[in-house]
């Protein structure tokens, strides 16, 4: 049996599917990609037993249906070394010997029986179905992932929370010290629903959506979710448990408002952090009318750094401390030229938002303060 396909398109899809393959699988067959040829199309599948990614490609030609699996790393590494050209696969249906022929050579591989490959069960029970714009969903997940925890004692914090309600879809992650929340205001539902996506599938969805256009369909029940874009279908197990009430930790009354240039803030913060204590990089923010002063000190080595930035400030003069490395993370995961820092007092969380929000979107970052010694 033979079929032909573009080398660059196949390589691109295999590279994406390869992110699913675990370094150590409970089932040896999961070290393989599943190939299914029918109706002049090639369906490719990768799985680690809890996460399955599926894509369909159009073939240049084929002379019949066949299913087989082949080692993922071998085929992935081999195909990516071939420049764009048609590849011809010849598969012996009896012993699954595979020959991949290209312009200047060929590869010989041995496949395995596709019947050994585990099938992904369909969603059952009460299923919620919603849609979202691929580009905005990418932005929400991209902003959230850095804030997710890595805490075996609190597994619900180790992923990205999707909260659908009448106000829109909130894409949230937090590790207890920092929080990222992106609200997609045009994704609404009359029946509130939510789920927590593990970091691994969230990372894969982010990588997929970076190149996708149009709408994404999200279907989920209490245990599993299916996220379908134009080119990929991802099925995965969800994190079970209740995500904390993130709205309750966001201060509502923040009369002190600092507006300043985000890029200038990042550059100044990077410079003063050189002089901070490596174990506890505390950065002090002194805010007064017209300027914000960043300062750090490392008493162990007798060094310190200070830099002033121009800003617009509405409020009383204030000193507040933050962990500098976390503040840098927040600023790097925001967009736009100007940001607004919203503060209540030095003991409460600081909120950072873009000065201008995108249409149908509201972005908010939160950072818990550190105690100042002076």
Label each PLM-derived region with a short phrase:
Residues 1-374:
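Structural preference for solvent-exposed beta-strand-turn elements
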């Amino acid at each position: 049996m033979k079929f032909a396909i573009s080398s660059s398109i196949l390589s691109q899809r295999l590279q994406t599917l390869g992110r699913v393959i675990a370094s150590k699988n409970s089932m040896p067959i999961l070290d393989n990609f599943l190939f299914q040829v029918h109706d002049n199309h090639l369906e490719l599948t990768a799985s680690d037993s809890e996460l399955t990614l599926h894509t369909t490609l159009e073939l240049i030609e084929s002379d019949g249906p066949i299913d087989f699996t082949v080692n993922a790393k071998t085929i992935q590494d081999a195909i990516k070394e071939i420049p764009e050209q048609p590849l011809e696969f010849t598969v012996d249906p009896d012993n699954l010997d595979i020959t991949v022929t290209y312009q200047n050579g060929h590869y010989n591989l041995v496949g395995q029986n596709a019947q050994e490959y585990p099938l992904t069960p369909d969603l059952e029970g009460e299923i919620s179905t919603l849609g979202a714009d691929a580009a905005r969903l990418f932005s929400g997940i991209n902003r959230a992932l850095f804030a997710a925890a890595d805490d075996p004692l609190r597994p619900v914090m180790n992923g990205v929370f999707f909260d659908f309600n009448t106000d829109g879809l909130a894409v949230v992650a937090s590790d207890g010290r920092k929080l990222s929340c992106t609200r997609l205001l045009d994704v609404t539902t009359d029946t509130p629903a939510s789920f927590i996506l593990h970091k691994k599938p969230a990372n894969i969805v982010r990588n997929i959506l970076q190149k996708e256009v149009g709408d994404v369909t999200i279907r989920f029940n209490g245990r599993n979710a299916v996220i379908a874009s134009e080119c990929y279908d991802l099925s995965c197990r969800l994190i079970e448990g209740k995500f904390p009430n993130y709205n309750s930790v966001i201060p509502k009354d923040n009369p002190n408002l600092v507006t300043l240039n985000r890029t200038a803030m990042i550059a100044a913060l990077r410079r003063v952090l050189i002089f901070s204590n490596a174990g506890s990089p505390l950065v002090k923010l002194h805010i007064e009318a017209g300027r914000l002063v960043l300062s750090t000190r490392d008493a162990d080595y007798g060094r310190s750094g200070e830099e002033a930035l121009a800003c617009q400030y509405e409020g009383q003069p204030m000193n507040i401390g933050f962990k500098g490395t976390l503040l840098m993370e927040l600023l790097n995961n925001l967009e736009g030229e100007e940001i607004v820092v919203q503060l209540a007092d030095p003991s409460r969380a600081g909120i950072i938002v873009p000065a201008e929000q995108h249409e149908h979107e509201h972005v908010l970052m939160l950072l818990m303060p550190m105690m100042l010694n002076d």
